[in-house]
């Protein structure tokens, strides 16, 4: 009976460690799954969404 207890206990410990690591990793992935805030453009300093190719005169 004691030959079974040690491997079973080791298996339980390894399973708990793997489960904890998985939960911790998933929590980190969910927390980092957000878009960074976009900086607002200054309309006085640039023309947004328009391509300027230079002086065409």
Curated annotation (Swiss-Prot):
It comes from the Bacteria. Residues 34-57 are annotated as: Disordered. Residues 1-32 form the signal peptide. Keywords: Signal. The keyword Signal applies. InterPro entries: DUF2613. The keyword Signal applies. Pfam families: DUF2613. This is Putative secreted protein ML2569.1.
């Amino acid at each position: 009976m004691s030959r079974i207890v040690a491997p079973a206990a080791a298996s339980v410990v390894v399973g708990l460690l793997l489960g904890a690591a998985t939960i911790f990793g998933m929590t980190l992935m969910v927390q980092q799954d957000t878009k960074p805030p976009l900086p607002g453009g200054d309309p006085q300093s640039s023309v947004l969404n328009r391509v300027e190719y230079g002086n065409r005169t």
